[in-house]
């Protein structure tokens, strides 16, 4: 297991993630993109229910990618949202990203840290459409020379095996 970081470093990384979440909630997508490393991998797979006996044996059921995006692909998603023609976001969703249980560890790569957080993403749209996305995120963040941060990897793991929302146009 990798070493945990100092309280100060944990706080700084947590604050970076809180700021990033507020940019998404405020629809400041270009500012959010600026927080991403050029090499970002932004992924989410389907969640499959596995039998207890299979999990004990380490057998993982097959899954499918929901997201497997690069920065270019995320930029295209945001450009589409900015056109006002993305039907899934008309009217725009109101979101709230809640992040908790933040655990930060060092990695073998200098200035790159592994972060695990639990999250709840609340999404409201129109008058009555409400969706909750709950799960765990596995992020990697990079500290830059000027002491700024960039998101290098995000792997989103949903607790739900069935997604009941009309679409997945929100960003996690």
From Swiss-Prot:
Domain of life: Bacteria
CDD domains, per database record: ring_hydroxylating_dioxygenases_beta
GO biological process: 3-phenylpropionate catabolic process
Single GO molecular function: 3-phenylpropionate dioxygenase activity
Family: Belongs to the bacterial ring-hydroxylating dioxygenase beta subunit family.
SUBUNIT field: This dioxygenase system consists of four proteins: the two subunits of the hydroxylase component (HcaE and HcaF), a ferredoxin (HcaC) and a ferredoxin reductase (HcaD).
Keyword NAD appears in the UniProt entry: yes
Pathway assigned to this chain's UniProt record: Aromatic compound metabolism; 3-phenylpropanoate degradation
Organism encoding this protein: Escherichia coli O17:K52:H18 (strain UMN026 / ExPEC)
Role according to the record: Part of the multicomponent 3-phenylpropionate dioxygenase. Converts 3-phenylpropionic acid (PP) and cinnamic acid (CI) into 3-phenylpropionate-dihydrodiol (PP-dihydrodiol) and cinnamic acid-dihydrodiol (CI-dihydrodiol), respectively.
Protein keywords: Aromatic hydrocarbons catabolism, Dioxygenase, NAD, Oxidoreductase
Gene it is expressed from: hcaF
Enzyme Commission (EC) number: 1.14.12.19
Reaction(s) catalysed (UniProt annotation): 3-phenylpropanoate + NADH + O2 + H(+) = 3-(cis-5,6-dihydroxycyclohexa-1,3-dien-1-yl)propanoate + NAD(+); (E)-cinnamate + NADH + O2 + H(+) = (2E)-3-(cis-5,6-dihydroxycyclohexa-1,3-dien-1-yl)prop-2-enoate + NAD(+)
Protein name as annotated: 3-phenylpropionate/cinnamic acid dioxygenase subunit beta
Cited NCBIfam families: 3PPDioc_HcaF, PRK10069.1
Entries under InterPro entries matching the protein: 3PPDioc_HcaF (IPR054881), HcaF (IPR023712), NTF2-like_dom_sf (IPR032710), Rng_hydr_dOase-bsu (IPR000391)
